[in-house]
């Protein structure tokens, strides 16, 4: 592991990170063509007094693809791995359950991964031509309001999790394939096509715009949950937008504004969110 007050990496070629990088004061910046984190974490923990809401604690700028290769696991409040657990959906929300008693949620358990970007309560900014999150984490949860901004010029595959206590904004010019996008405040996504396998959740109230605000140009395939726990869901897009809500799909919110050329619903649509 490498620990320093600030970590700044810049290369015209590719960057491969296979050991943890920890910035304790001024954050982390990475500029490269492609970047891969293989079972390694980039961690930024600037003191709260020095943190600036407009300055990312982790700032990634790539002309190519960001790839995270890791293993999801569950952890306690101190980051220690909890064995014998898995992630399930309950009323549209991801919960960590005991594999021996699948109906029992494990109290105080948190999602984690051995690969990813961690900036507790601080902003994370990612600009890249592509994203492949294979079991990794992009995480700015904590006691503050750190937000996450993603600007992806092509496709984005999120088979890990992306989570923040602040606003999560993602613009994807290609197809977004998602497992878990989680915001304790607002979630705003703009993409060409959306394939949601598990959870896209916004747990905060509306703040002038709907808490869960989705703009999809062409097609939505939902086999998981689109959940606004305390606010509204807005789902709009191009003139030919097609929405398919599969049998396992949930669209749950306190009010829905859905406009599409075609809507095929075999799942659940509800204007009152669970919880």
Residue ranges and their predicted role:
Residues 1-275:
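Low-complexity, glycine- and small/polar-enriched segments
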